[in-house]
A protein has these predicted regions:
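Nucleotidyltransferase catalytic core that binds NTPs
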Residues: 3-4, 9-179
């Protein structure tokens, strides 16, 4: 796991919240284990699972109905007090765009510091996302890999267009984005 953070010096932050977005088509043990590991490793207060209603990079016929995925997620996290599910993208009309979701969560929780959790496969395509460069101004990233995946040097996965704006912070073992 690699953390990509913003150069944030907010005073009084009391909540570090993970936002685990995705299709969850369907939710499985790998998602839950990843969320649990990230929760502990990064000392988060909670992890919010946000299933996308209309994923921009997937066709409708390959995705289970959003309400069914929401129900499956809700059942899967039952009993885990630090996991919650948000229906933000399910109730919002149109395509599900991460930047809009993060902005809405920040409005709802102005004292929180958000960490968007995603897999390396998704992060490698982030420069195809809607307003992807703005995401680096809005949230921190935690990029996860699947067990057995080859080691990737973190500086090689940062999109080339914004690579110069990242600096390695050895103390925290993370890349920090400075706008």
């Amino acid at each position: 796991m690699v953390r990509f953070g913003r150069n944030d010096n907010k005073e009084g932050i009391i909540l570090n919240i993970g936002v685990y977005g995705g299709t969850f088509n369907p939710i499985h043990f790998g998602h839950l284990r990843t969320a649990e590991e990230v929760f502990h490793k990064f000392k988060l207060k909670q992890v919010i699972f946000v299933p996308s209603a209309q994923p921009p990079h997937k066709s409708d016929e390959e995705v289970i109905d959003p309400l069914h995925r929401l129900k499956m997620l809700t059942l899967a996290i039952t009993g885990n007090e630090h996991f919650t599910v948000s229906d933000l993208e399910i109730i919002r009309p149109g395509k599900s765009y991460t930047v809009e979701t993060i902005r809405e969560l920040k409005k709802q929780n102005p004292d929180a510091n958000f960490y968007f959790i995603l897999g390396l496969d998704a992060f490698l395509e982030i420069n195809t996302w809607y307003h992807w460069q703005e995401l680096f101004l809005e949230t921190n990233f935690i990029v996860t890999t699947r067990p057995g995946s080859p080691q990737v040097r973190p500086n090689r996965i940062i999109p080339q267009e914004i690579r110069p704006q990242f600096k390695w912070k050895a103390k925290n073992k993370e890349f920090v984005y400075s706008s």
